[in-house]
Amino acid sequence: MYTLVLIRHGESLWNRENRFTGWRDIDLSPQGIDEARAAGKALREQGFEFDLAYTSVLKRAIRTLWLIQEEMDLMWIPVIRTWRLNERHYGALTGLNKIETVEKYGEQQVHIWRRSYDIPPPAYTPDNLDNPSYHRRYQEIKRSDLPMTECLKDTVARFIPYWNDEIAPVIRSGKRVLITAHGNSLRALVKHLDNISDTDIPDLNIPTGIPLVYELDDNLKPVRSYYLGDEEKVKAAMEAVKNQGKAK
C-alpha cells in the first residue's frame, strides 16, 4: 500500500479577486499563507511523512510547499519543480475577472471555457508579452511544447506522461510523495487515478489548501481517498470553487 498526498496551492491574490490566473505567476494571499500553514500542521499532527515533493514552477504552488515543509520540519527533503505541473493555461482569459467575463460572454460560454474537457479558451497571440517562450524559466523547453491556451485535455496530455514516467516509479520504489500543484493540473491527475470520464470531470472541484490523501494499491490504483479536513468545510470550499464563474 502506498500513500500519496495532493494539495492545491493556498488561495492566491488572483483567486481572491476571482481572476483567471493560469500561467501568470501570482503569489499567495494572506489567507492562502494561512491555508498552507494549516495544511502542514494537519499533516504533521496526523503523522504524515514525506521523502520527496513535486511542484510546479509557479510561486503560489512553490510557496505553499515551502510553508508545508516548514510546518512539518521537512525543509531538507528533495523538491522537483516542473512546468508539467503548472496550472492549465487560460490563454486570452488570463487576468480577466470571472464575473465580468460572464457578463460579457454569458455564463454558459464561460462555463464551457472553465470546465469543458476539450474546448480551450481563446489563445494568446504570439506577440503577447505573457507568451511562455519569452520567460527564462521556460527557455529549456521546446517552443512547440509551450501552450498559448489549454483545455483540461491538454493539461492531461502534458502531465500524465510525466506522472507515468517520473512520479509513479518513485512511488513504487517506496518513496512517500507530496505534490503541491494547481486546481486543473490536480484535476488532470485525479481524473487519471479515479478513472473519471470526460463527461463527469467538469463536476470535479478541488479546493485550495486542503490535503487530498490517496491510498494506492500495488498497481497505484486508489483503495480510498479523502480530504484531511472537516467534511462540511471541504464541501463549502468545493462549492465556492464551483460558483466562481456564475453570475451573481
From Swiss-Prot:
Record field: catalytic activity: (2R)-2-phosphoglycerate = (2R)-3-phosphoglycerate
GO biological process: gluconeogenesis; glycolytic process
Domain of life the protein comes from: Archaea
UniProt KW keywords: Gluconeogenesis, Glycolysis, Isomerase
Record keyword Membrane present: no
Main EC class the enzyme belongs to: isomerase
Residue numbers binding substrate: 8-15, 21-22, 60, 87-90, 98, 114-115, 183-184
HAMAP family xrefs: PGAM_GpmA
Name the record gives this protein: 2,3-bisphosphoglycerate-dependent phosphoglycerate mutase
